[in-house]
């Protein structure tokens, strides 16, 4: 349905069906590229609740730029992991590999129970005052 619009509308990145949070939708392909390409280093921040305690050594491991996910031929770009509680963390990425947050946390023994993307670049979900499923137009200068 979205692709049949003129101009076509696409999302800036994706969220899997088990993930909630901020999703941008636009008809500007250059904007999508600017926001999603690892070359532009646009931060995407996620909050995760895990089924097991998150090991402290994961902070340094994720930041190292040497962390490899199964099935990948390149290591993950350095990521910032903040452990908020033993089973709750905030993870900042500048790339978007398939199910990356879930795979990274599972690889260190802390499978994700719930996941929410809380920001993309300078746009923060909590500042938008939106309920789940609500949407609003955003001016390009807000990003």
Model-derived regions, located:
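Basic, flexible Lys/Arg- and Gly-enriched helix-loop patches that mediate nucleic-acid binding at interfaces
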Residues: 1-143
């Amino acid at each position: 349905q979205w692709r049949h619009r003129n101009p076509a509308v696409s999302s800036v990145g994706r969220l899997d069906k088990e993930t909630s949070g901020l999703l941008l939708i636009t008809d500007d392909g250059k904007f999508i590229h600017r926001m999603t390409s690892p070359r532009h280093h646009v931060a995407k921040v996620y909050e995760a609740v895990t089924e097991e305690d998150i090991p402290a050594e994961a902070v340094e491991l994720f930041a190292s730029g040497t962390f490899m996910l199964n099935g990948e031929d390149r290591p993950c770009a350095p990521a910032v992991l903040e452990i908020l509680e033993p089973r709750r963390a905030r993870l900042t990425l500048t790339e978007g590999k398939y199910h990356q947050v879930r795979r990274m946390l599972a690889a260190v023994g802390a499978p994700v129970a719930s996941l929410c993307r809380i920001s993309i670049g300078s746009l923060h979900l909590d500042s938008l005052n939106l309920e789940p499923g609500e949407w609003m137009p955003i001016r390009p200068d807000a990003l």
